Amino acid sequence: MSRTLRLVEPAGPAPGEKPLRVAIASNDLENLDAHFGSARQIAVYEVWKTGARFVEVHQFSSATDQKGRHDELEDRIGPKLEALSGCTLVFALAVGGPSAARMVRAGMHPIKRKEPEPISAVIEQVQVMLNGTPPPFLRKVLGTWEKPDFTADFEEEEV
């Protein structure tokens, strides 16, 4: 007798709707509760207007301590940025300035939170933003950015 177990994926976004890849620094995979540099795990989700799904989790053996101290010879941020390639938003309790700059250069937007919160709440907040008016950089990523057309403002009125 054999057994096959498969993960059943929830329904994805509607046709034509591009999901947003979101990374969340977590120690327990239930809460946003880690600093980016010291996170041993980072969960990645695809989020769209009406749903979300877990994609993967990245685990890291070497992390900086909570005070940001680490071996100067070892780059601990580079492997995290490589693993998160394709993510647009990266949520963490804290992100150091140099790490944030490297994220931005890699096309990611770091978002710092003051207090730990459930991952489900973070996903819900992203969905609310997607259903409202996302900032211009996200509209560009999602393919919904339309340059303003001011030509009508300059057309002459016919008398």
Curated annotation (Swiss-Prot):
Record's protein name: Protein NifX
Pfam families linked to this entry: Nitro_FeMo-Co (PF02579)
Keyword Hydrolase: no
Highest taxon of the lineage: Bacteria
Residue pairs linked by disulfide bridges in the UniProt entry: none
Family named by the database record: Belongs to the NifX/NifY family.
Record keywords, A-Z: Nitrogen fixation
Cross-referenced InterPro entries: Di-Nase_FeMo-co_biosynth (IPR003731), DiNase_FeMo-co_biosyn_sf (IPR036105), NifX (IPR013480), NifX-like (IPR034169), NifX/NifY_domain (IPR051840)
GO BP field: nitrogen fixation
GO molecular function, one term: metal cluster binding
NCBIfam families cross-referenced by the UniProt entry: nifX
Biological function: May play a role in the processing of the iron-molybdenum cofactor.
SUPFAM superfamilies: Nitrogenase accessory factor-like
Cited CDD domains: NifX
